[in-house]
Amino acid sequence: MSRKYFGTDGIRGRVGEYPITPDFMLKLGWAAGMAFRKQGHCRVLVGKDTRISGYMFESALEAGLAAAGADVMLLGPMPTPAIAYLTRTFHAQAGIVISASHNPHEDNGIKFFSGQGTKLPDEVELMIEELLDQPMTVVDSSKLGKVSRINDAAGRYIEFCKSSVPSSTSFDGLKLVVDCAHGATYKVAPSVFRELGADVTVLHAQPDGLNINEGCGSTHIESLQAAVLVGHADLGIAFDGDGDRVLMVDHTGAIVDGDELLFIIARDLHDRGKLQGGVVGTLMSNLGLELALKDLDIPFVRAKVGDRYVMAELLEREWLVGGENSGHVVCCNHTTTGDAIIAALQVLMALKRRGETLAQARQALRKCPQVLINVRFGASKVDPLEHPAVKDASAKVTEALAGRGRVLLRKSGTEPLVRVMVEGEDETQVRGHAEALAKLVGEVCV
């Protein structure tokens, strides 16, 4: 059964445009509450990032959940992985995140966690969608849900993050710059690193509801690079608006992406005999990651793009680590979803154990030139991926790469974009192929 509302990462869109409207969120809260109540007494945690529309949608969801008889526990602004963790520790039936991740404040969205802190199973999402098409009813007044606020949510999550670091380990003397993207990590991330001993300079931690991800964070890393160089820091850490993505900058100002961070974490676990299986990447993971892991005899598999698919592959194989080059990194020995702060801590510990700088550690992975071009296709009725001219051109590029590269065309699960990716050994050749394919995709979408 196809989904009407849920994409690869929940429901997302422009605020005020259906379905990102208060009336829909009221109905969604009710439908979710009715679905979760089938498990018995229902308790749902609700958290959000720092965008201004979060207050409006929090109230709407709260009312809908209560109307269905679900008790609601409000977390306030918290990183997405913190909501997953707290859902688990409070033994709730589900957690709801109000966030549009790395998108600007004009967007917002909803995603759900199961009681185990994992992404909601497909069958539950489909049940919620079916309920959304039914008339909304209200339970008897004696069975209405109650609403409370968890005042120590941030402190609980800070202690959880610190517990992932051995008590014998300290980051004394480590000079960090941390970019919080004016987002959900703005309170907890600086506290975690400081309480573990690091000297922390904080950037972009003054959210006003409108500035989340604006020229900062993991999608705009230039100011972090400058701050690392000016402050002579050991490295910089950039989070996205909801705290499930992380990128780093080494002391030279070079960007260290999710593939490189994943390799550093996996190699450290491998060195200590604690890797347990292999590593899960995605179709977008750089070929260099696969080759570097192969040199260490570490198995590598590719999942579909999206951290939910990485997580599903990890669970099926009972492996520990996986991630995306965008900075979603999952460490199943600590978390049930991508957690940017936890991933950053694992990288810092790996560097400390090896006595390496981040710049030295990233040299072990030689990335192949990879060009990614996003092509917007708007309201076009043409499916560019099925167009004969696009399929023929893609096949010809694959043939030209002669087994020494890859071509990938895919639709974004959250935006009206086609992502054109070409990877190979010669950067000039790769860029030429990518630009030609992107131009063709744009032409057939007109």
From Swiss-Prot:
Q: Which UniProt keywords apply?
A: Isomerase, Magnesium, Metal-binding, Phosphoprotein
Q: What Enzyme Commission number does this protein have?
A: 5.4.2.10
Q: Which reaction does it catalyse?
A: alpha-D-glucosamine 1-phosphate = D-glucosamine 6-phosphate
Q: Name one GO cellular component term.
A: cytosol
**Pfam families referenced in this protein's UniProt entry, alphabetically:** PGM_PMM_I (PF02878), PGM_PMM_II (PF02879), PGM_PMM_III (PF02880), PGM_PMM_IV (PF00408)
**GO biological process assignments:** carbohydrate metabolic process; peptidoglycan biosynthetic process; UDP-N-acetylglucosamine biosynthetic process
What the record notes about the co-factor is: Binds 1 Mg(2+) ion per subunit.
Query: According to its UniProt record, which cofactors does this protein need?
Result: Mg(2+)
Family statement: Belongs to the phosphohexose mutase family.
Query: Know the name of this protein?
Result: Phosphoglucosamine mutase
